[in-house]
């Protein structure tokens, strides 16, 4: 693998992504948001380029907050969903949060708590948003943990615990990943307990 700046990627005459020295890029892991890439002239070359993105294009659907009101419309009242609607720009009611469609790690989030108090985070995201019923995180000594889970098919594969000192989990949150494996490895050391990370 080789690291390359986005500005150093070009498109060849036959529509393939290349480095500055015209080496064809066959596989790419990128940190650039898919929604930004797809909105640019550069991104229009993706479908015919033969480039394999290690973050697949379908992930843009799941990372778009617009999926939340659509899920609510189709599965209203489901115990694993919070009520969500596309934002009309009206005042945010108590007990609700506003989230830009394309945002990450708690940026640009106003949270109107059920008790009437507010908490907000700043960030670079603008544009359309959704509103969602807020589910307040439990505080442990002023810290707010959030568990994210990964399920492939019907198998649990991992969890990530993010903890922030704010009710809005931001990019400064502490993070501990955990893998869920089918076979348990031997303990790290005798008497140290059986903790696997």
Where are these regions (language model features)?
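Domain-scale recognition of functional cores that engage charged ligands
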Residues: 1-197
